[in-house]
């Protein structure tokens, strides 16, 4: 990586979350900005829940901030700050990226779902026809559910401790993806051949599994949105059973090009 040069004309991008130490975006996007010839940097912002709204207003009011990435747990809370939403963000009610427009307004969109699907396809996985159990119906989970349904999975069982949230997502999917069988579940079905953790479980070293999974058939595809230097509990479980897997790092890589295009309007 070349030496980072910052001056008064440097444009700023920030990633906002709680916690923030786990994120890989600042290093990656500083490199991508430099490769694109942009005088821009991305910085991490650790924002506590009670200060999130104020922080967003302050950041979006700064004239030299051109974009924001939003990570856990704020993807849903960030959506109302956008002047307009892209198609995916409108569908799921959450954003993971915001871009300042020339007139000072802000556009928000969600790339987690597309990033997860692209990450899986890059590894040669075929998603069509899969019977999916999905842990988590928050911003990332909603986006992944939409993209998996669009990719042609046969069924999707949504597992979330907030039943109302899971039911709301299921209802949206039944309308937008009528060919996919959608249900709200409390556990992984025995006929599931794809399991995805789209919850925050696995971010801490002390975390266990997002739910009861049990023994896995080696043909089961396992995914996790948690970006970690080491394998998360669910990915370790998959490896022990000889299952192929899509990690949070795969999802992160899968959406980096789309996010750069979003920020640069390429």
Language-model region placement:
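Phosphate/diphosphate ligand-binding glycine-rich loop within oxidoreductases
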Residues: 3-123, 231
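Short, conserved loop/helix-junction motifs that constitute active-site signature segments
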Residues: 6-7, 127-128, 152, 212-220
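Glycine-rich adenosine-cofactor-binding loop
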Residues: 17, 110, 120, 125-153, ...
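Short glycine-rich anion-binding loops that position phosphate/pyrophosphate groups of nucleotides
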Residues: 70-77, 140, 200-203, 228, ...
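Active-site capping/gating segments
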Residues: 118, 227-228, 243-266
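Conserved S-adenosyl-L-methionine
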Residues: 150-155, 240-244
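NAD(P)-binding Rossmann-fold cofactor-contacting core
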Residues: 153-176
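Rossmann-like adenosine-cofactor binding region
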Residues: 177-245
